[in-house]
């Protein structure tokens, strides 16, 4: 019985092969299921670690990024705006751009300062610059020279300077002339009436003379030196300065140098005759110069010296494309000089693309008013201005300059003054060349007491002994105001500038004027003193960024974010793009 029970206990149920296989397969599947579940969980954990939610990411970023103050944010915004504005096509010729030519070293000249000046230590040089209030930037800057004799000019040039009453160089000449004579590219910033013209005219004559003595210019060749000016009047004035120094050199036995005034309003045939004989020096306005180059009447193959006078006007929107076209015609490296009383950061950044290792010579802040001018600002109602003008003319003896924003005001004032028996002449862009020349020559000669003009006469024109400048209206741009009042107080003489303001002027313009008066230590009228001034709060931004006022136009009463000039130019660009898009002329092109 027991043996039967043992057998029953040890009995193993028979499982068929098919069933065993099915059980084994089921176990395998179960194991796989568990493994896949574990893998899924592991993958989920990995994903959770690798990809946090956007909210988590944003929180982490905020935590990781250091806090930026409001001041730093404004500085970054302004920096981006300036980079965007300066990101334009460089001032290089088509050939240079096509071949990828970049000049890394300035042009060499044979000029060297005397040994005793070369031996001056850097401390001695800096001391001279400090005494003359000269600020320089750049590498390997030539030393300042305090007299014309040490600059090694020929005797006829020195005699002509003496005849003109120029015995000692002005601050811009002390540093600017050695820089240019050494062959360096330069940005010259100095207030009007500081002697900028001689700084680029004298070295150009020396270079032309040197080239002529080495290899005389053949018929149809030239120019060697080119000066570009924004207005016909300024070009004519510069040309006259060139002629004043060229004539004595010829009389002293030096090779003759031919110079050409290349401006509109003059018959092109007479200009072409000079070019055909071979020309050394050309003083031009952008329009006529561009025309002659495009028609292949003149070439810049031999040109090695270029000056942009009143560069802020030339490189600005008005003449920017014309200047680019002029640069397209250069065949080799040239020495490039930019001069102006106002040189905003925007223009400096843009212009540096054309310069090789430039030296910046700054005599007084760019855009600062001449300290020899007494500035008087008066609140005058619009309807009372023309009558009050007669009272203002009594402040000083003639000659007096009156500036207006628009041509109609110039004509009205001119007519009113003639009716009142005042010897007056007028110029503006609407008058023909003959009238403009008569007005300027008779005023310069002292035959007329008053010149009424638009801003065409404010850009660099040199009228001797101007006692008084009257701004019939405040210009929209503060740099135009600086140019206007710079017609008086020249060469160390004191002058008066009277400006009429009223509610027609924008607050931004008046704030710029207020800060300019403060900088020049002038009396602030109550109407300006009462203005709500946001720049008082913006002082920390100015200190942090190193830029005082607007980096675009140079105005002290606002920052670049509120610049009226920039806003105006943006709106002009938008309207121009609309014209291009919709068509503004030709077949089916009229709006």
Curated annotation (Swiss-Prot):
Keywords: ATP-binding, Helicase, Hydrolase, Metal-binding, Nucleotide-binding, RNA-binding, Zinc, Zinc-finger. GO terms for molecular function: ATP binding; ATP hydrolysis activity; RNA binding; RNA helicase activity; zinc ion binding. Residues 177-361 form the Helicase ATP-binding domain. It holds the Pfam family zf-CCHC. It catalyses: ATP + H2O = ADP + phosphate + H(+). GO terms for biological process: mRNA splicing, via spliceosome. PROSITE patterns: HELICASE_ATP_BIND_1, HELICASE_CTER, Q_MOTIF, ZF_CCHC. A motif (Q motif) lies at residues 146-174. InterPro entries: DEAD/DEAH_box_helicase_dom, DEADc_DDX41, Helicase_ATP-bd, Helicase_C-like, P-loop_NTPase, RNA_helicase_DEAD_Q_motif, Znf_CCHC, Znf_CCHC_sf. Its EC number is 3.6.4.13. A zinc finger (CCHC-type) spans 548-565. SMART domains: DEXDc, HELICc, ZnF_C2HC. Residues 372-532 form the Helicase C-terminal domain. ATP binds at residues 190-197. Disulfide bonds: none annotated. A motif (DEAD box) lies at residues 309-312. Belongs to the DEAD box helicase family. DDX41 subfamily. The Q motif is unique to and characteristic of the DEAD box family of RNA helicases and controls ATP binding and hydrolysis. This is DEAD-box ATP-dependent RNA helicase 35. It comes from Arabidopsis thaliana (Mouse-ear cress). The gene is RH35.
């Amino acid at each position: 019985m027991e043996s039967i029970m043992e057998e029953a206990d040890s009995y193993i149920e028979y499982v068929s092969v098919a069933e065993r296989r099915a059980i084994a397969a089921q176990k395998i599947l179960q194991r796989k299921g568990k493994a896949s579940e574990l893998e899924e969980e592991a993958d989920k954990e990995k994903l959770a670690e690798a990809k946090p939610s956007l909210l988590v990411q944003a929180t982490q970023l905020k935590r990781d990024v250091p806090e930026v103050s409001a001041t730093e944010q404004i500085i970054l915004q302004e920096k981006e705006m300036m980079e965007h504005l300066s990101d334009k096509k460089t001032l290089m010729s088509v050939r240079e751009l096509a071949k990828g030519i970049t000049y890394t070293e300035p042009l060499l000249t044979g000029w060297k300062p005397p040994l005793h000046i070369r031996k001056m230590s850097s401390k001695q040089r800096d001391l001279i610059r400090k005494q003359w209030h000269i600020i320089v930037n750049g590498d390997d800057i030539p030393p300042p020279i305090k007299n014309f004799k040490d600059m090694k000019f020929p005797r006829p040039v020195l005699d002509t300077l003496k005849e003109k009453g120029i015995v000692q160089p002005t601050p811009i000449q002390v540093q600017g002339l050695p820089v240019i004579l050494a062959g360096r590219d330069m940005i010259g910033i100095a207030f009007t009436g500081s002697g900028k013209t001689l700084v680029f005219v004298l070295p150009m004559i020396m270079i032309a003379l040197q080239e002529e003595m080495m290899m005389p210019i053949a018929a149809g060749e030239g120019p060697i030196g080119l000066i570009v000016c924004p207005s016909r009047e300024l070009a004519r004035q510069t040309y006259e300065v060139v002629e004043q120094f060229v004539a004595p050199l010829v009389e002293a036995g030096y090779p003759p140098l031919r110079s050409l005034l290349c401006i509109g309003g003059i018959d092109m045939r007479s200009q072409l005759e000079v070019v055909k004989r071979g020309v050394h020096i050309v003083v031009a306005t952008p329009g006529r110069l561009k025309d002659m180059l495009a028609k292949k009447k003149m070439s810049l193959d031999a040109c090695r010296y270029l000056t942009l006078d009143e560069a802020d006007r030339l490189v600005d929107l008005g003449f920017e494309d014309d200047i680019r076209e002029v640069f397209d015609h250069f065949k080799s490296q040239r020495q490039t000089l930019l001069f102006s009383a106002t040189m905003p950061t925007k223009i400096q950044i843009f212009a540096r693309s054309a310069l090789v290792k430039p030296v910046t010579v700054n005599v007084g802040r760019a855009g600062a008013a001449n300290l020899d001018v007494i500035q008087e600002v008066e609140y005058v109602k619009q309807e009372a201005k023309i009558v009050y003008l007669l009272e203002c003319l009594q402040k000083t003896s003639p000659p007096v300059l009156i500036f207006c924003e628009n041509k109609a005001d110039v004509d009205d004032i001119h007519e009113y003054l003639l009716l009142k028996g005042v010897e007056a002449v007028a110029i503006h862009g609407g008058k023909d060349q003959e009238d403009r020349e008569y007005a300027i020559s008779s005023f310069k000669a002292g035959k007329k007491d008053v010149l009424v003009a638009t801003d065409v006469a404010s850009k660099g024109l040199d009228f001797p002994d101007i006692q008084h400048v009257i701004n019939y209206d405040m210009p929209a741009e503060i740099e135009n105001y600086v140019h206007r009042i710079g017609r008086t107080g020249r060469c160390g003489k004191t002058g008066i500038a009277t400006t009429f303001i009223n509610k027609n002027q924008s607050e931004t313009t008046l704030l710029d004027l207020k800060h300019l008066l403060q900088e020049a230590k002038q009396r602030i009228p109550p109407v300006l003193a009462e203005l709500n001034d946001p720049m008082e709060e913006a002082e920390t931004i100015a200190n942090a960024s190193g830029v005082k006022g607007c980096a675009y136009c140079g105005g002290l009463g606002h920052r670049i974010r509120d610049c009226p000039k920039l806003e105006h130019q943006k709106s002009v660009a938008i309207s121009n793009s609309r014209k291009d898009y919709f068509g503004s002329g030709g077949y089916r092109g009229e709006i």
